[in-house]
Amino acid sequence: MKLLIIKIDTSYEVEDALGVFATDNLKALGIESRKRSDFEQAGWLHDSTVVEMDDIKDLPKDTYFYAYFDEEADKDELVEKFQAKLEELKSYGLNTGEGKITTSYIEDQDWNTAWQKYYHVIDFSRHLAIVPEWEDYQPAFSDQQLIKLDPGLAFGTGNHKTTQLAMMGIERAMVKPMSVVDVGTGSGILAIAASKLGATNVLATDISDESMTAAKQNSALNNLTNIKVQKTSLLAGVEGKFDIIVANILAEILLDLIPQMDAHLNKDGQVIFSGIDYLQLPKIKKSLDENNFKIDLTMKQGRWIGLAITRKEK
């Protein structure tokens, strides 16, 4: 099987908007971005990362955005839609960069390994670092926990702002050993983070077979036995209640999750949301209010919003 790659020479300012457009509107199989700043700040200046000299000449002026599609997808139609989206973003006064779009094809199995040289250690916080399984890394702090990860094609490598917002929320909420459910687990990164931070038992749910496989493999890679993986839509069929519900998924899906939360949240439990575009925040707030929840903390990175949520006091 081959994958169609659409590459856009663009700007970090519209990176997130292109990502949402590619996944939501065009149903991309995967997205990726490479920014010059990633290498300048976390590449050759980071002891744990090696950037080969041959790669430097290929770095973007600003940002390369990649979207991956099935080889049978209509290449010309997709290019036209991306061009129209760039024009729309430019009309808002946003910097879209050069806007050059190129296409190519790659063998699926080649993609699974070729991209690895662009994915390196992420020193997320004093307590957590995300380490690809092919890299050797020593903790920066004596109490720093390492999340070993082989994300493959599953969403959730730790690079994206939405994943980082969700991890920030988990760190803040985990004040004692707690039970956690990670809804829409993807690669399992948030479930693993919760376990590493002291969760006593963790449930990871997803509707995707690929995510189920990735989450199980990544849990095993971290030698974790307290993470259970369940294939289901959101919390359907999930038994029991949890101290923390975490979900890094699109706002439209969060709206379906909100009515299910009360039945699965312990007294004084907390909910962590991420994956919310700031334009979607008003309807999330409205639904939370209608379901007896309130926002305790709003976190923001770029256009993405993370929320810490609890029940309203009666």
Swiss-Prot record:
Arranged from A to Z, the UniProt key words for this protein are: Cytoplasm, Methyltransferase, S-adenosyl-L-methionine, Transferase
Q: Which InterPro entries does the UniProt entry name for this protein?
A: Ribosomal_L11_MeTrfase_PrmA, Ribosomal_PrmA_MeTrfase, SAM-dependent_MTases_sf
Q: What is its main location?
A: cytoplasm
Catalytic EC class: transferase
GO molecular function annotations of the record: protein-lysine N-methyltransferase activity
Cellular location of this protein? Answer: Cytoplasm
User: What Gene Ontology biological process does one annotation of this record name?
Assistant: methylation
Which terms in the GO cellular component ontology are assigned?
Answer: cytoplasm
The record's section on Pfam families has: PrmA
As recorded in UniProt, its EC number(s) are 2.1.1.-
Reaction catalysed by this enzyme: L-lysyl-[protein] + 3 S-adenosyl-L-methionine = N(6),N(6),N(6)-trimethyl-L-lysyl-[protein] + 3 S-adenosyl-L-homocysteine + 3 H(+)
Q: Where does S-adenosyl-L-methionine bind?
A: 163, 184, 206, 248
Q: Which domain of life is it from?
A: Bacteria
Q: Which PANTHER family match?
A: ELECTRON TRANSFER FLAVOPROTEIN BETA SUBUNIT LYSINE METHYLTRANSFERASE (PTHR43648:SF1)
Function statement: Methylates ribosomal protein L11.
What family is this protein classified in?
Answer: Belongs to the methyltransferase superfamily. PrmA family.
Q: What is this protein called?
A: Ribosomal protein L11 methyltransferase
Q: Give the originating organism.
A: Lactobacillus acidophilus (strain ATCC 700396 / NCK56 / N2 / NCFM)
Provide the organism lineage as a comma list.
Answer: Bacteria, Bacillati, Bacillota, Bacilli, Lactobacillales
